[in-house]
């Protein structure tokens, strides 16, 4: 199983004081050195954390691959074609939200998403759609030509009872298997921590997890190398469980 380390909140800390540090590039290189299989960045329309220059700098510095999260806008499409990341994950975006609140509604935007997917695919960029684990959305993702889906794990991570967490887990598990049966590559992420990652990592249909906020929070106490190492180890051990 692959680990994508999201470095958005390295930029959040930097921007809080308007300084040049901590460096997203340095964070990306440290994460790679200590187990990250890819680096994920979300260039939001309001540029609240990652800036345009960060994306170019990280793309040019890393040895693994860049997964660029972006909204379904012409501006972001143009940026992606300039940066040329290995992967683009199209996500829903609202300016007033603190973080991404739900999955992309592919059903409601099939024509536009299909157009973006074709343009990016023709440019050699693999497209992923960040969606809820809903069979209709998963089928729509396949219909628009996206080869990859990233299942939104936020409801699982935020569940306030064990019963609700189990319900959300089963939804993700079923969605992952359905997507896999359709021939889609399945990733997952949002809200995952060292404490809740194991069940998700046990779903064999899921190939990659993208994790950011909790890793950066852990890094405040453990250091980024150890935070990445522990997450990677937790994912590895989960795969060994019956």
Curated annotation (Swiss-Prot):
Class of the enzyme per the UniProt entry, highest EC level? transferase
- Which controlled-vocabulary keywords does the entry list? Cytoplasm, Pyridoxine biosynthesis, Transferase
Report residues binding 3-amino-2-oxopropyl phosphate: 6, 17, 191, 212-213
- Reaction(s) the record says it catalyses: 3-amino-2-oxopropyl phosphate + 1-deoxy-D-xylulose 5-phosphate = pyridoxine 5'-phosphate + phosphate + 2 H2O + H(+)
Q: Which residues make up the binding site for 1-deoxy-D-xylulose 5-phosphate? A: 8-9, 44, 49, 99
The metabolic or biological pathway listed in the UniProt record of this protein is: Cofactor biosynthesis; pyridoxine 5'-phosphate biosynthesis; pyridoxine 5'-phosphate from D-erythrose 4-phosphate: step 5/5
What are this entry's molecular-function GO terms?
pyridoxine 5'-phosphate synthase activity
**What is this protein called in UniProt?**
Pyridoxine 5'-phosphate synthase
Query: Could you read off the lineage of the organism from its UniProt record?
Result: Bacteria, Pseudomonadati, Pseudomonadota, Betaproteobacteria, Neisseriales
> Which Pfam families does this chain map to?
PdxJ
The record's section on InterPro entries has: Aldolase_TIM, PyrdxlP_synth_PdxJ, Pyridoxine-5'_phos_synth
- The record's EC number reads 2.6.99.2
What gene makes this protein?
Answer: pdxJ
Positions of the site: Transition state stabilizer?
Answer: 150
What is one GO biological process annotated to this record?
pyridoxine biosynthetic process
Looking at the UniProt record for this protein, which Gene Ontology cellular component terms does it annotate, in alphabetical order? cytosol
Residue stretches in coiled coil: none
Q: What does this protein do?
A: Catalyzes the complicated ring closure reaction between the two acyclic compounds 1-deoxy-D-xylulose-5-phosphate (DXP) and 3-amino-2-oxopropyl phosphate (1-amino-acetone-3-phosphate or AAP) to form pyridoxine 5'-phosphate (PNP) and inorganic phosphate.
Q: Which family does it belong to?
A: Belongs to the PNP synthase family.
Q: What is its main location?
A: cytoplasm
Q: Which HAMAP family match?
A: PdxJ (MF_00279)
The answer to whether the entry has keyword Cytoplasm is: yes
Kindly list the places in or outside the cell where this protein is found, as annotated in its UniProt entry: Cytoplasm
**Assembly, per entry:** Homooctamer; tetramer of dimers.
Q: Which PANTHER family match?
A: PYRIDOXINE 5'-PHOSPHATE SYNTHASE
The record's active-site residues are 42, 69, 190
């Amino acid at each position: 199983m692959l680990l994508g380390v999201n470095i958005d909140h390295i930029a959040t800390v930097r921007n809080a004081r308007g300084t040049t540090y901590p460096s997203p590039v340095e964070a990306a290189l440290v994460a790679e050195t200590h187990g990250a299989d890819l680096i994920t960045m979300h260039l939001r329309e309001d540029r609240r954390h990652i800036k345009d220059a960060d994306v170019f700098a990280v793309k040019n510095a890393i040895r693994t691959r860049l997964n660029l999260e972006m909204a379904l806008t012409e501006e972001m499409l143009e940026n992606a074609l300039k940066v040329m990341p290995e992967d683009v994950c199209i996500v829903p975006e609202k300016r007033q939200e603190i973080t991404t609140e739900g999955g992309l509604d592919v059903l409601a935007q099939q024509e536009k998403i299909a157009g973006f997917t074709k343009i990016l695919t023709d440019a050699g960029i693999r497209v992923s759609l960040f969606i809820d684990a809903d069979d209709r959305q998963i089928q729509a993702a396949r219909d628009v030509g996206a080869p990859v889906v990233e299942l939104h794990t936020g409801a699982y991570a935020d569940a306030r009872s064990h019963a609700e967490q189990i319900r959300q887990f089963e939804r993700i598990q079923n969605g992952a298997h359905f997507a896999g049966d359709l021939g889609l590559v399945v990733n997952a992420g949002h809200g995952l921590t060292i404490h809740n990652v194991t069940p998700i990592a046990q779903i064999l249909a899921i190939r990659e997890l993208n994790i950011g906020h909790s890793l950066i929070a852990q890094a405040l106490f453990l250091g980024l190398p150890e935070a990445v190492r522990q997450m990677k180890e937790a994912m590895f051990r989960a795969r060994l469980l019956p």
